[in-house]
């Protein structure tokens, strides 16, 4: 059976992304990864790390499924996209900010055309892209804008001893002071609709059970610690329950992540970034992934950053990237079935 082609963007060239991608050489999992990046950079990083890899130039018309070279050496298909400036491990250069975005644009175009079944992204450095003069808050927002998608949902997921943990966010990269005003009834309703639809379509869960967090301590304590639960969250949950969605909450966030409550749901919806991701990353760091829900294409990512201090050392753990590639392939297979 032919494995789905997954575009893997190598991310910030000074970070750990390129060397994580090298670890996909000889990959025997559920996907055929195609690395998007500067071939000379990848070759140089492989040589510095002592990795014996055969690099093939990716050709869409003659891709083949060649994780192993004819000589038995681990191989990688590379779609070469040249750096804007030379790059050294651990040393950021704003000149390469546009290069990083070109990787994303090419992967997205390939997914939209059907050349790739999905895309998985290695980490980028938001600061260096902004220093290059391009406003950038993250992959999630960038891909939403590029696909003219009015609302997408950021969800991180990973396996724990008690089973899968999936945490979606109502708001993403916002200062904490701006969060309450951003949580409107319309935003919350559309976020829940996207989460529910993609848990069905991308994860194959027939009737998803979603646990919804409150915004305030103690979920507002009956209005004494905030009114958002009463005025925004509860009315939206009541409306969507009336349509048949299995929603529970709003829960106090500090108790929602306890095993007895998590066992009652297939996914959690947190109100803001650190409310949800602190618990998720504590439980799954290094093996968790990021999934963008609501896009017209499939996109997964690692759950960590560029780790400049590890770049070029060979010590970076590729587990999250491996899982991101595998999950992208599984989603693509469900979409086809």
Region locations from a protein language model:
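Anion-binding alpha/beta catalytic cores of soluble intermediary-metabolism enzymes, centered on
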Residues: 1-228, 234-337
């Amino acid at each position: 059976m032919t494995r789905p082609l997954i575009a893997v963007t190598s991310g910030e060239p000074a970070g750990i992304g390129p060397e994580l991608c090298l670890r996909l050489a000889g990959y025997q999992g559920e996907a055929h990864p195609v690395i998007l990046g500067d071939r000379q950079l990848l070759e140089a990083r492989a040589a510095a790390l002592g990795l014996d890899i055969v690099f093939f130039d990716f050709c869409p018309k003659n891709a083949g499924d060649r994780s192993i070279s004819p000589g038995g050496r681990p191989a990688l298909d590379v779609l070469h996209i040249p750096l804007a400036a030379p790059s050294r491990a651990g040393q950021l250069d704003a000149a390469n900010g546009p290069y990083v975005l070109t990787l994303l644009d090419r992967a997205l175009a390939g997914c939209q055309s059907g050349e790739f079944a999905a895309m998985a992204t290695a980490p980028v450095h938001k600061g260096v892209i902004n220093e290059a003069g391009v406003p950038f808050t993250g992959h999630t927002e960038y891909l939403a804008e590029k696909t003219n998608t009015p609302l997408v949902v950021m969800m991180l997921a990973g396996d724990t001893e008690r089973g899968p943990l999936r945490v979606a966010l109502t708001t993403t990269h916002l200062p904490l002071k701006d969060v309450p005003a951003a949580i409107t009834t319309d935003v919350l309703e559309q976020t829940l609709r996207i989460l529910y639809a993609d848990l069905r379509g991308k994860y194959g869960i027939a009737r998803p059970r979603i646990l919804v967090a409150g915004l305030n301590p103690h979920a507002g304590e009956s209005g004494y610690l905030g009114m958002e639960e009463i005025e925004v969250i509860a009315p939206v949950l009541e409306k969507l329950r009336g349509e048949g969605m299995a929603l529970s909450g709003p829960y106090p966030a500090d108790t929602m992540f306890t095993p007895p409550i998590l066992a009652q749901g297939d996914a959690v919806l947190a109100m803001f970034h650190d409310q949800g991701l602190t618990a998720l990353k504590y439980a799954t760091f290094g093996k968790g992934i990021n999934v963008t829900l609501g896009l017209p294409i499939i996109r997964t990512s690692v759950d960590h950053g560029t780790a400049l201090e590890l770049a070029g050392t060979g010590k970076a753990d590729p587990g999250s990237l491996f899982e991101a590639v595998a999950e992208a392939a599984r989603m693509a297979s469900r979409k086809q079935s």
